[in-house]
Amino acid sequence: MSVVNFYGQLSNTQQFDQIRINIASPDQVRSWSFGEVTKPETINYRTFKPEKDGLFCARIFGPVKDYECLCGKYKRMKNRGITCEKCGVEVTVSRVRRERMGHIELAAPVAHIWFLKSLPSRISTLLDMTMRDVEKILYFENYVVVDPGLSILQKGELLTEEELQKAKDKYGEDAFTASIGAEVIQQMLKELDFSKLKQELYDELHITSSEVKKKKLVKRLKLVEDFLESENKPEWMIMDVLPVIPPEIRPLVMLDGGRFATSDLNELYRRVINRNNRLKKLIESKAPDIIVRNEKRMLQEAVDALFDNGRRGRAAKNANKRPFKSLSDMLKGKQGRFRQNLLGKRVDYSGRSVIVVGPELKLHQCGLPKKMALELFKPFIYSKLELYGIATTIKAAKRMVEAEKPEVWDVLEEVIREHPVLLNRAPTLHRLGIQAFEPLLIEGKAIQLHPLVCAAFNADFDGDQMAVHIPLSIEAQLEARVFMMSTNNILSPANGRPIIVPDKDIVLGLYYLTIAFDNEVGEGMMFSDLAEMEHALYNKFITIHTKIKYRRDQLNAEGKMVPVIIDTTYGRLMVGELLPSNPNIEFKCINKQLTKKDISLVIDLVYRHCGQKATVIFADQLMKLGFKYACSSGISFGMDDMVVPESKSTHINETQLEIKEFEQQYSNGLITYGEKYNKVVDAWSRCTDRVANDMMKEIATPPINDYPNHQRINAIYMMAISGARGSFQQIKQLGGMRGLMTKSNGQIIQTPIISNFKEGLTEFECFNSANGMRKGQIDTALKTASSGYLTRKLVDVAQDCIITEKDCGTDKGIEVKSVIEGGEIIVPLAEKILGRTAAIDIFHPVTNDLILNKGELINESKLEQIESAGLDRIMIKSVLTCESSTGICSICYGRDLATGTLVSEGEAIGVIAAQSIGEPGTQLTMRTFHIGGAATKGAEVSSVEASYDAKVKIISRNVVINSEERKIVMSRNCELLLLDDNGNEKARHKIPYGARLLVDDGDIVIKTQKLAEWDPYTIPIITEKSGKVLFKDMVEGISIRDVTDEATGIPSKVIIESKQYSRGAELRPRIQLLDSKGEVITLSNGLEARYYLPVGAVLSVEDGIQISVGDIIARIPKESTTTKDITGGLPRVAELVEARRPKDHAVIAEVDGRVEFGKDYKSKRRIIIHPIDGTLSIEYMVPKGKHVVVNEGDFVKKGDLLIDGNPVLQDILKVMGVEVLANYIVKEVQAVYRLQGVKIDDKHIEVIIRQMLQKVEVTDSGGTTLLVGEKIDRHEFDEINEKAMKNGLKPAEAQLILQGITKASLQTRSFISAASFQETTRVLTEAAIAGKVDKLRGLKENVIVGRLVPAGTGYFMDKMRKAAVKLDEENV
């Protein structure tokens, strides 16, 4: 017995390592077949026996009953293998009717519709004709010239019936050959000489210069090469013989009432057979050509309908006008073979029921209803009853179970003991949606679920249902216990934080328990042990909230117990008692008012220092304590708990006065409508916040004087502050003011809702509010589907990402630094590098001690060293730079977030990444602005303040001093840094062009000092020199217009689009500055003082006046930039991972250089960058209306924006490279999730980016057979280059290309995986022509062919099997 079979399952399934797909040749089809189907009949409706030679013929497909021939001459096993001489049926199992195929010999060749109509059409590409033309030939509309002979016709020219007749008359009957139908296409394909054609195409490709032609040639060449490599013959795309699939797969079922229900395929096959037989007769009886041709066309259409109904022309329909389901439809879509039956199967030994809460369960338990358990564990019970001799036979055992005898229950208890069951709640969005528990038998019919796992399942008890599955084999039970037990899933795989955290009531109970009140009974008493305190509590000398002193023994670093005196309360000591004793876990971590966040941190701490078992026990006890005090605290929620602040009316009156002032300014023409709108919205935002803050202050400190009638602490406030339920946003709406609302298009309505829910809304307010709420409801309904689809696409693209080795040995890595936004550090460096590995040795910058070795995992203790060393950026290894040929290595991935240790081999990190990004997707709003319709627009930023005492450093400082002695920033990329004493960056602020700087380089500033200020609503255009204004190209009514505001009657000059006028096409409105002599002033950079004005700019100066340095010439209102829809939430994530071009995308500079504006072209402006290294200048064409953020003469750096907007990802990759691109995508995706408070580890996003960067585009073929412009997998590309270099040839060159996840999934190396994702027919057609081999490396392909997935335990089985094969080969 070979080693392989030892590992093979004890079944007769074939062992194989790869699957190949090819076009079937006519001989192959005949070799599969067990006989020709010649009659369209199915079953004789009187005898119900299959008709001979029909679609269900027993002679061809096998017997209908096991070991029994059709006429009944031979029956039973003893006759197996005999073929009955009377009816011709082989005596065997009826199962063969699922396997045996038949065939139909076609009377005329027929084109396979997949190769004809699946775009790009393979047949027409090979023949170099258009698809339209090929169709005309195939469907008998036109003749094609096969051999021009003596005529002047071209080979391949199409002729209609009349033209053919004329040509025959002109050149004679036999002068040339023209033909029609599939026969001629087959002949033309047969005549193709591929090696010759390949050479011709190569030569043509090198000569041609047209890009379009090149693309076409590359496509054709690729196809020719595919045929050459796969040894497929092109004429096989035209079929002479048609396979008939086994009858059991297209069954005919009898319904009650003597009618039959049949599979659509039978009907489609019948049409083919009928038309084929008719055609045979017509050919035999030498019918006129026109009739034969019509029949051939009908046969072609019948075969088309069988293969892919509706692909061409009208779909064949049944009597009820419903289109027939063809072979293609069987595979396609959610209901197709792939997704319905191969990737999603229904399973036996399962049940489902409603869930109820089980607070007295332990974390690893669930309550299983007795009825359910009895049914699910039936076979186990039978075997045990028989084993113990309680029942003599299985039948007796069955009867006992049905009667529910008492001994059955005892046996059930025993069977169930330590046999884990799986619980699953749909939708299973991440791997924690299925977990294993030990069942406890309970009365009733509902499953009991432990409260702490609800967060992972996203379950609540308002009628949710859950499914139970029983792992049967010992291996399955083992895996369930080791990998899936709820106690082994404490940390979330998405971010490495505990997911088993107390929530809702438990948090509220613990918060209440740990409150310390002032002036409580017995304050300041001293205690030395808990019993004494309990006594005092029982006799009402203290309460659980009294501040007391307590002597407690604590473990020190040496592991000795030392007594310490602490200020605490009895409540906190109760929590403290539950803490496991460990020197790293001090009492102070819980000696405070515990909020949800604090509790989560404590659990994390316990997990890191005391391990999993201690954590589970701790969490369970914490839960019981929390429930107890949530109950005994008697916290309730009443109308009086919503406090309306007294200052509300004052704030509202002040704001209304402010808004009146804006209205006045608007009527006086000082500000535009857009500016007024922005200011009004801002004022109301500020007002709402003020009211909310006052309300919060009042809620947080309730009046103490009338205690005990009044609660010591506000219940609503407690719920929100503890993190139990509700947010301050919601409290604001209950007791403050609802604030601004959004319209359904996302615009903010200027009049806010002044009332809150306690006071009640007016009719008008109610209408406004309902509008926003409806929008929110609709969004929620729509986003669930798109979120699910995004998850599916992510899983598909990353499913073959598996950890395959320990270390790939690369030296590459990526540099990470903390994320700074608006000057605040949002994500500290520590959070970004925790659980990653160092790419280089890392030393202390001052002492030069080694902190981290290359490849060492950065854990919590190393983090402290890095933080104390004050490092602000670090090189870490990343999956993006991993060089494993298949999969990814452990070192590049780092810590497995679910366990907190280095990731093990065989872990399916791709799927985990996809789930981590997709699971929170449903929480992401479609639009970023709604909380129940309330607008959450912050006030516009118009200044920056120092957030620390620090030293100022200004980058690219370009400042002019204006007439008021103020410093005005003239640089487009000025940044202000705040440095600490060691010179480390603490904050970074972008200072916009035109801002007033209030500090200078090197100044020392104190916290909250203002550093710079600017007008947030307009972008100014500012002069660098003093001089006289001269207007150029400003033609009234064509390029500039006096706009009079209807509301105010005040005119202002505005630049307008001039292209609608013929003479306006060349106009470029600008302002020049003249000196005293009337000549144009020269600026510091050597260019003339010219200021181009974009469309929409409002002039602030008159022609001919004198202005000084730093004056504003014109303002560009910013309303045009704020109203454009900011794509947020889920659509933004989808836009990024699909690598789509954003709407209104930015243009980025490709090189460092100076900007010049060239001559305009039609409706486009020309921006030219002259590189500093003197290479060729680069031109950009941008639409005129867009706001260009650079001015003539500005110096730009590579990657700077020339036009505002989101940059195109492909541009970033081309200009800045992979690392910058990856950082950008990670930053943008994280920004969306951060807004919703969702934490996801960067490495998950990096895994997806790696999958998007799998392909390269060849730029130079070198000495290889690759074609320029061909897209190829980067590992394949490296292999080809290695071969070339071994043979002494020049290697090819290529550049990385970024693909969206859908495209990347469809172009994966595995055709099975791609076909089961989308566009099934296209993928299979391509794969068949290329004769692709699927190595079965990913998860999906293996699930589909029914093997263990090569991840987790399956990975090692796979490894062992491969080792076994090797051993066997060596032994042979």
UniProtKB/Swiss-Prot annotation:
Name of the encoding gene: rpoC
InterPro entries xref list: DNA-dir_RpoC_beta_prime (IPR045867), DNA-dir_RpoC_beta_prime_bact (IPR012754), RNA_pol_asu (IPR000722), RNA_pol_N (IPR006592), RNA_pol_Rpb1_1 (IPR007080), RNA_pol_Rpb1_3 (IPR007066), RNA_pol_Rpb1_3_sf (IPR042102), RNA_pol_Rpb1_4 (IPR007083)
SUPFAM superfamilies: beta and beta-prime subunits of DNA dependent RNA-polymerase
Residues that bind Mg(2+): 460, 462, 464
GO MF, one example: DNA-directed RNA polymerase activity
CC cofactor: Mg(2+); Zn(2+)
N-terminal signal peptide: none
Annotated keywords: DNA-directed RNA polymerase, Magnesium, Metal-binding, Nucleotidyltransferase, Transcription, Transferase, Zinc
Top-rank taxon, per record: Bacteria
Task of the protein: DNA-dependent RNA polymerase catalyzes the transcription of DNA into RNA using the four ribonucleoside triphosphates as substrates.
Stated family: Belongs to the RNA polymerase beta' chain family.
EC number: 2.7.7.6
Assembly and oligomerization: The RNAP catalytic core consists of 2 alpha, 1 beta, 1 beta' and 1 omega subunit. When a sigma factor is associated with the core the holoenzyme is formed, which can initiate transcription.
UniProt GO cellular component terms: DNA-directed RNA polymerase complex
Pfam family for this entry, one: RNA_pol_Rpb1_3
A biological process term (GO) from this entry: DNA-templated transcription
Catalyzed reactions: RNA(n) + a ribonucleoside 5'-triphosphate = RNA(n+1) + diphosphate
Binding site residues for Zn(2+) 2: 808, 882, 889, 892
Positions annotated to bind Zn(2+) 1: 69, 71, 84, 87
Cofactor mode of binding and number, as noted: Binds 1 Mg(2+) ion per subunit. Binds 2 Zn(2+) ions per subunit.
Protein name: DNA-directed RNA polymerase subunit beta'
The organism's taxonomic lineage, starting at the top: Bacteria, Pseudomonadati, Pseudomonadota, Alphaproteobacteria, Rickettsiales
